């Protein structure tokens, strides 16, 4: 499969990016990027999501292990280049059952937890492992010394089990964390006083340490309202800073990271402002924690995941998520504390949407529970916010100097137009120099259908390299919104196969084919960005070798005549990819390419008009220079009905 031939840069950009009406009254923004001027490391601190199963939590397995969630996690894990790495999950310990035998003490059944963690690992994801829940309601009071000791043994047993199952190198990457939001007192049937919470914390800490000192543990994962509110949050910090360890009697208890929850109330900058105020107070009260990593592992723009909001359906949400990331990497000068760059920033948006709001809840995918087929089945669509995570994944580890100005005035990241830019130095023959410039146009939760922002982007300092090319990817509502297509189709409750095909055609950004980069090392693009929108410029030198092989190809059933293919790019070795070529063979002998738009997402729904899906599949990467990599190992698929039994919606209204 070969990328389309290069076109004149001006005409190509007009075709792809100037579809918006001209913003006659607006002065243009000027974006300058210097590829020769690296500022600092750019860590991908945003690669996390999360969700909560519904009540009753003792039946969390019905949600966590449901077919719907298996599909959802396939989508989450299919973000290219590890663009989402962690799924922070509430009530994990409710997946364990406990039994007490005379003379034997407590014994545990880990079958459901094994299944969920296996599912994450299959999708190359890590758990954000909250030590939350009471197996079979055996733990009720953490001021009871016997229960505290038993809890330590449970945590140690759990950690040893998964070190043995997966290896320490994998489990040591997990973020073990306290019970979620302890000051909200969602403990189900567990009595949790301040002292009980501190005893619980020490039992978790020492249980993990007994399994391996390499395991990471932090908390408290809550709002940290100013004292005297949030007593468990502040009490835990006081305990870890000055208190006595329940088990060892030593002063001070380890706290590997401080996790807090600050959401935006509809504002991007409000997230950062709250974080800065809280962290400044923590560092003032507890100076030993000045260098302790800070996580905001629920940093959503708005509380209430199930609350339907039109902006959550389309590129408005996607652009706002990118804007929040940029504000954390480049804090506005007026906000002072530039030292606060969180070690982790997570959106809590891996929930499953439910009827009648498939697109407008705080989710990465849109779920349709299609009940007019026999048997009923589930379909997911990729929302623009999930595609935005794929664009963020194209950023690399060296942040470049970049500046946005308008009318001669330099603008910080708390404005409508912003930028993140990065560069990468090669690490092998399948790798080469590259640079990424990611522009956002975002007015937070507000969309302006008739407004476009004129922008001039100037990139300079690009070094000479073999086969140097550039590619643009644009994400906006007119062309890249499955929700918009759904509305144009009349908002069908049970879309047909053809309607799903039309909605999926809007999932990917609009890609302009690779073009030669100017020999001068400078490039100027004049564009008009829809408000909201994202625009990514990717500049790549040609590696010595073509891409490596696609691995882990799987086929998952959806319904008659439709199959989901998902694969891994872990051995592909290059980010400068134009598409994945997917080939199908009904007889396992003669393979033909499947016709589709260019896409580098590691997932594809095959839904041919012929409805013939039984056969063999293979996939290979194609780079910007039209060089294919090796095919994956083929996978053979025989059509079978997908599992049924859709899960209930989650109950966590304030998440």
From Swiss-Prot:
Single GO molecular function: L-iduronidase activity
Disease: Defects in IDUA are the cause of mucopolysaccharidosis type I (MPS I).
Transmembrane feature ranges: none
GO CC annotations, alphabetized: lysosome
Protein known as: Alpha-L-iduronidase
Keywords of the record: Disulfide bond, Glycoprotein, Glycosidase, Hydrolase, Lysosome, Signal
Signal peptide: 1-25
PTM summary: A smaller 63 kDa protein probably arises from IDUA protein by proteolytic cleavage.
Assembly information from the UniProt record: Monomer.
Glycan attachment residues as annotated in the record: 109, 189, 242, 335, 371, 414
Covalent S-S links between cysteines: 540-576
InterPro entries: FN3_sf, GH39_as, GH39_C, GH39_cat, Glyco_hydro_39, Glycoside_hydrolase_SF, Glycosyl_Hydrolase_39, Ig-like_fold
GO terms (BP aspect): carbohydrate metabolic process; dermatan sulfate proteoglycan catabolic process
Binding locations of alpha-L-iduronate: 90, 180-181, 263, 298, 304, 348, 362
Top EC group: hydrolase
Catalytic function, reaction form: Hydrolysis of unsulfated alpha-L-iduronosidic linkages in dermatan sulfate
Binding site for alpha-D-mannopyranose: 53, 55, 57, 305
Chief localisation class: other
Intracellular or extracellular location(s): Lysosome
Family assignment from sequence similarity: Belongs to the glycosyl hydrolase 39 family.
Catalytic site: 181, 298
Pfam families the UniProt entry points to: Glyco_hydro_39, Glyco_hydro_39_C
EC nos: 3.2.1.76
Organs and tissues of expression: Detected in testis (at protein level). Expressed ubiquitously.
